[in-house]
Amino acid sequence: MSVSQAVRNPRGYLVRTLEMYRALLFDPEHFYDEYLGSRGLRSEILMVAFVGVVGLVGNYFARQEVQSVFVEAAIPINSDTNFELIRLVIAPIVGIFILWIGLTIALYAVSWLYSTIGQFYELMKRSAWAVVPLVVANLLHSIAIGYAATQVTEDQVDPQNVPQPPIDRAHHMWDTAAGEIYVTATILVGAVFVIWAGYIAAYAVRDVRDLETSEALRVAAVPAGLYAIWVLYQGVSAFL
């Protein structure tokens, strides 16, 4: 449905959009057969960017809140510290694009064990939609870290415990919010959505490589399983 049709019939556009995402999440086979367009990657790039921005919003708010507390506590924040804080803020949007590309490469490489047909470009277009479940993980983390940042007070800032090296100082500041147990819990919960993304990715690679569904599931289980293990490791490490 075009933009002009959406303007003329917003209700119909909304219904079709909801049906499309329901199919993607719960019936990816139908989604790829019915809804995936044949044009360029514009829609996919925008969609992946949106998933990253959802995570970035909470990080940006947390940085503003935490930095203001440390400034009030007379803790110097130089350009190197500020740069590292910015890097932490934009990590979700940079990371989601790296994840998309990495997922595509992994699916293409592992599926080579079963088939050599299919174009990398087509797989990249399809695998972009597999990251959609991660928008929920990013949303939960954004809400959690945003709330945690509002709870940081000047009384919690001990100048004696603030590291001197700029990068260490940035991480110390960040951890005053990111280190809260409920923020860490959202990282662990994120592993569930990684597995969900892997399920969708199986159908992304299936038709491109002309695989059996069982073969596609085994292919997708490799990158999804490894990434889920890494996410769990990150979450558990934060608890320790």
Protein language model features and the residues they cover:
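N-terminal juxtamembrane cytosolic/stromal segments of multi-pass membrane proteins
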Residues: 1-58, 77-79
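Hydrophobic alpha-helical segments of integral membrane proteins
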Residues: 6, 10-35, 89, 93, ...
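Hydrophobic alpha-helical transmembrane segments of multi-pass membrane proteins
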Residues: 18, 89-98, 185-195
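Perimembrane loop-to-helix junctions flanking transmembrane segments
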Residues: 28, 69-84, 166
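Membrane-water interface at transmembrane helix exits
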Residues: 59-67, 107-111, 115, 141, ...
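Interfacial/capping segments of alpha-helical transmembrane domains
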Residues: 60-77, 154
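Alpha-helical transmembrane segments with an aromatic anchor "belt"
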Residues: 79-157
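Hydrophobic alpha-helical transmembrane segments and adjacent short intramembrane/lumenal linkers
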Residues: 122-234
